[in-house]
């Protein structure tokens, strides 16, 4: 079996697995490692087809979750950002023995706008999929720029995201298209409605990809979960507000100690 890139560090006794979003790799977490490493055993994963896990083609959400779970510690906290939030959520649903708590960041159980549900317009995602084959690098750059739009440090944060992408070979177009297909089609709203493990959802107030209205809708639909909307943050709050973000994670872990 081909191994995913899986880097473990930290001095704590609580396992925390971090899953990156579309187009990126585990390098995106380096800005908060120093803040979390004293408290956790961190597991930084390159999802199949991304970063240093290049030996994979496009995968479905279920297959990606199954593959990641195969290398995972038991009873870990899982933190998934954006598309990584879908992967972490799918693992929590299908491999609950791996999970003691779930944190999703700037993520949605359904990224696509539907009747009375806010999200990305289907034609926008379809447009990104089409543009990948025409102008691969520019399409990825446009998507990264959307993630930091509106924050005080928008340009600086976008440059950081771009540098993370360029650290390693770019994912294949097939992998990126498959990731957009996951964002376009996945809908875990019903499946997660009965989820009973500790679950925190973190949002950016200025996020243009996951509207903050998602937070209030899920507060009503999933009253057993908790949500935090970070003021001044967009789609990557751990980059624009690393100290506040790290405190949220530490508090969640402390409140849900076993």
From Swiss-Prot:
One of its GO terms (molecular function) is pimelyl-[acyl-carrier protein] methyl ester esterase activity. GO terms for biological process: biotin biosynthetic process. One of its GO terms (cellular component) is cytoplasm. Pfam families: Abhydrolase_1. It catalyses: 6-carboxyhexanoyl-[ACP] methyl ester + H2O = 6-carboxyhexanoyl-[ACP] + methanol + H(+). PANTHER family: HYDROLASE ALPHA/BETA FOLD FAMILY, PIMELOYL-[ACYL-CARRIER PROTEIN] METHYL ESTER ESTERASE. Pathway: Cofactor biosynthesis; biotin biosynthesis. The active site is at 82 (nucleophile), 207, 235. Keywords: Biotin biosynthesis, Cytoplasm, Hydrolase, Serine esterase. Belongs to the AB hydrolase superfamily. Carboxylesterase BioH family. It comes from the Bacteria. It is found in: Cytoplasm. This is Pimeloyl-[acyl-carrier protein] methyl ester esterase. Residues 16-242 form the AB hydrolase-1 domain. Substrate binds at residues 22, 82-83, 143-147, 235. It comes from Yersinia pseudotuberculosis serotype IB (strain PB1/+). Its EC number is 3.1.1.85. The physiological role of BioH is to remove the methyl group introduced by BioC when the pimeloyl moiety is complete. It allows to synthesize pimeloyl-ACP via the fatty acid synthetic pathway through the hydrolysis of the ester bonds of pimeloyl-ACP esters.
